[in-house]
């Protein structure tokens, strides 16, 4: 018997290779597993999904990083794109992204599972009060701390989160009640997601199984959604 809060490639591999039974096997999904967390997003901000092409899982790591630094970040470096939060699920990716931010001399603060409480409070305060352009945030930190970060006007998912509820929870932080009134215009807000075909299980949790399949089989590499429906 395998029990997990979320589907993942590692468990799928064990299931397919090692879980054999002459009477067969059964897989049960939790209630709402087909709907996707996007149905729980209540803010009016459009969600833009960018598909990155890669021929292997190993290649996808560098392809994602290259797409992020060369295709996504040039737009968010503009002065009009202050209050940008970059959410990074993997700590190894987080370190790589943080090192790139340092070498590029970008104005940022960071919150991770290894950050001290004093540093976290300082980083959040500077981000909210326009003193830092970017905030780097890790998935593991959010899993344990569940910070309701204020001041986010632009949210970048470096990779879809492991847990679907994180996708809707973080996206809903763009609501007006979490904003600094002096931080910018309500018309200048965005949610960006970078994904590859190897993120299929994570994508399903975010947008639902049917929509995820359509996204991966589509000729278009860019998809725009409003909360609850695709454009």
Model-identified regions with their sequence ranges:
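Structural motif
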Residues: 4-6, 56-59, 87-91, 112-115, ...
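Short glycine-/polar-rich loops that comprise or flank the Walker A/P-loop
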Residues: 81, 106, 150-153, 186-191
């Amino acid at each position: 018997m395998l029990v997990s809060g979320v589907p993942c490639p590692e468990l799928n591999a064990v299931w397919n290779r090692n879980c054999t039974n002459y009477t067969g096997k059964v897989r049960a999904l939790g209630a709402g597993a087909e709907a996707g967390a996007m149905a729980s997003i209540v803010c009016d901000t459009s969600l833009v999904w960018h598909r990155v092409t890669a021929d292997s899982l190993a290649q996808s790591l560098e392809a994602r990083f290259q797409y992020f630094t060369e295709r996504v970040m040039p737009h968010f470096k503009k002065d009009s794109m202050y209050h940008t939060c970059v959410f990074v699920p993997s700590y190894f990716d987080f370190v790589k992204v943080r090192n790139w931010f340092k070498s590029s001399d970008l104005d940022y603060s960071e919150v991770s599972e290894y950050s001290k409480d004093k540093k976290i409070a300082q980083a959040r305060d500077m981000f909210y009060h326009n003193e830092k352009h970017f905030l780097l945030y890790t998935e593991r930190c959010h899993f344990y701390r569940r910070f309701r970060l204020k001041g986010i006007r632009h949210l970048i998912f470096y990779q879809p989160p492991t847990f679907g509820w994180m996708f809707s929870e973080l996206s809903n932080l763009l609501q007006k009640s979490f904003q600094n009134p002096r931080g910018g215009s309500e018309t200048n807000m965005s949610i960006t997601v970078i994904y590859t075909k190897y993120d299929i299980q994570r994508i399903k949790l975010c947008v639902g199984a049917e929509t995820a399949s359509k996204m991966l089989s589509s000729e278009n590499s860019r998809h725009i959604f409003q909360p609850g429906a695709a454009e």
